[in-house]
A protein has these predicted regions:
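Gram-negative outer-membrane beta-barrel transporters
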Residues: 1-57
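A general secondary-structure boundary signal
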Residues: 6, 40-42, 46-49, 77, ...
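Extracellular loop and loop/strand-boundary signature of outer-membrane beta-barrel proteins
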Residues: 11-19, 62-68, 130-135
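Residues that define the transmembrane beta-barrel architecture of outer-membrane proteins
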Residues: 22-28, 72-76, 101, 139-143
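Membrane-embedded beta-strands of outer-membrane beta-barrel proteins
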Residues: 30-32, 78-80, 145-147
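Extracytoplasmic gating/loop element in the C-terminal half of outer-membrane beta-barrel translocons
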Residues: 38-77, 90
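C-terminal beta-signal and adjacent terminal beta-strands/loops
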Residues: 50-59, 82-151
Length: 151
């Protein structure tokens, strides 16, 4: 478990104090991994992230003209791994396999809750020179298959 509280500010022309472009207010992260009881070849992992949004300004305008923050970043990933072969198994003693310690196969579900996090904004300007922020979203839920060979 990791918890951070952050504050990065700058003063512009000795009159306006604004957040730095990378100033997230908070970040909470969790990573948990464990074996299934009685099944040392099966591991489950869980990762969660909650982070405050970054400050954004419109193009051709500065922080003095105002800013807003992106929505908070939220994500939960879930993974399951199975050990195909370990160093003590007979198959791992022959040929090229003798160079390996373990072989794992796994499946992950990234962003299991399918949360639409904002990555940036596309700015649209109307005929009256008003600018509107249109969000660009990160990828939703993804399925990942993996094969890990430990040397």
């Amino acid at each position: 478990l990791s918890f951070s509280i952050m504050k990065a500010e700058q003063t512009i022309r000795d009159k306006v104090t604004v957040p730095m472009p990378n100033s997230q207010r908070y970040n909470v992260s969790l990573f948990f991994q464990d074996y299934f009881p009685g099944y040392k070849k099966v591991k489950l992992n869980l990762k969660g992230v909650l982070a405050g949004g970054l400050p954004i300004t419109a193009p051709r305008k500065g922080y003095e003209d105002g800013f807003f923050r992106m929505s908070p970043y939220k994500r939960i990933d879930l993974g399951l791994s199975y050990q195909i072969a370990g160093a003590t198994e007979e198959i791992m003693q022959r040929g090229i396999m003798s160079k390996l310690k373990n072989i794992w196969i796994g499946v992950d579900v990234f962003n299991i809750l399918n949360i639409k996090n904002v990555s940036s904004y596309y700015w649209v300007t109307d005929i009256y020179n008003q600018q509107y922020a249109v969000p660009n979203y990160l990828t939703g839920r993804q399925l990942n298959l993996r094969l890990i060979a430990e040397f």
